[in-house]
Structures are given as C-alpha cells and as structure tokens.
C-alpha cells in the first residue's frame, strides 16, 4: 500500500480531491499539500487539517482568532489529528501521523482552516 498522498490546492479555493483513502496496513500516513496557484498565503493561503467530521467546523471557527502565524488553529487543539502549515503559491508542506489515531467506524474529514475556506475546501478521510 502507498502510505502517502499529495493534495493540491488552488487560487479557486479548492483541493484536487474530495477523499483521502488510507490503507489500514499503513502504520503512518503522510499528506503533502501543494499550492498550484499564484496568490500569496496572506491572501489565498491553504492548509490541510484532519479531524473527526463533527469537529471540522468547530476547529475552523475556533481557529479564526488564532491568526495566520498559528496556522489558523487554536493552540494545542486536541481535536486536530494532523495538520500542515498554511502555504501560499508554489509552496508545499507535509505532515505524517500515526494511522492508529483513526478509529474504525468513526467519520473523519480534511479541510482548510483559512478563514472562509472550509465551505469549499473539505473532503472525507476513509480508512480502508
């Protein structure tokens, strides 16, 4: 199984996939985020955050006041399973996490916590 995926983000507030599939045989999984747009991160920055589906909007809401220096995530937010930094055009960042953090039967998702982006920039994380 390939235990990594690359997800691209754009100036049109979109990810290039709606689902990240993780093979149960993977001990760790790496997500690399790229940005193929042309806008800087303070204008059209994106990150990729993984959490339970039910926690996605609350994490994004709480992260608004944290600001870009903290990746628009509340300090020490235990609901966040993994996240990349906020990146701008031409940049990339990756994060590796233990697949054991994902429980069978629970619904997980990924999203961008940059203010206003979650409505268009989200998807599911599936354990296969």
Curated annotation (Swiss-Prot):
Domain Plastocyanin-like: 1-128
Superkingdom of the organism of origin: Bacteria
Coiled-coil parts of chain: none
InterPro entries, per database record: Azurin, BlueCu_1, BlueCu_1_BS, Cu-binding_ET, Cupredoxin
Disulfide bridges in this chain: 3-26
A Gene Ontology molecular function term of the record: electron transfer activity
Keywords assigned by UniProt, alphabetized: Copper, Disulfide bond, Electron transport, Metal-binding, Periplasm, Transport
Compartment(s) of residence: Periplasm
Positions contributing to Cu cation binding: 46, 112, 117, 121
SUPFAM superfamilies in alphabetical order: Cupredoxins (SSF49503)
Chief location of this protein within or outside the cell: periplasm
Gene Ontology cellular component annotations, sorted alphabetically: periplasmic space
Annotated function: Transfers electrons from cytochrome c551 to cytochrome oxidase.
Name of the protein this chain belongs to: Azurin
Record organism: Pseudomonas putida
């Amino acid at each position: 199984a390939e235990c990594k995926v690359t997800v691209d983000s754009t100036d049109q507030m979109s990810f290039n996939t709606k689902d990240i599939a993780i093979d149960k045989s993977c001990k760790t999984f790496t997500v690399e985020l790229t940005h193929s747009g042309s806008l800087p991160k303070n204008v059209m920055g994106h990150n990729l955050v993984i959490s339970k589906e039910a926690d996605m909007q609350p994490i994004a809401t709480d992260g608004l006041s944290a600001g870009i220096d903290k990746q628009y995530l509340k300090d020490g937010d235990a609901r966040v399973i993994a996240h990349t930094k906020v990146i701008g055009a031409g940049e990339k960042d990756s994060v590796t996490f233990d697949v054991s953090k994902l429980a069978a039967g629970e619904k997980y998702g990924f999203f961008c916590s940059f203010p206003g982006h979650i409505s268009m920039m989200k998807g599911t994380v599936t354990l296969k």
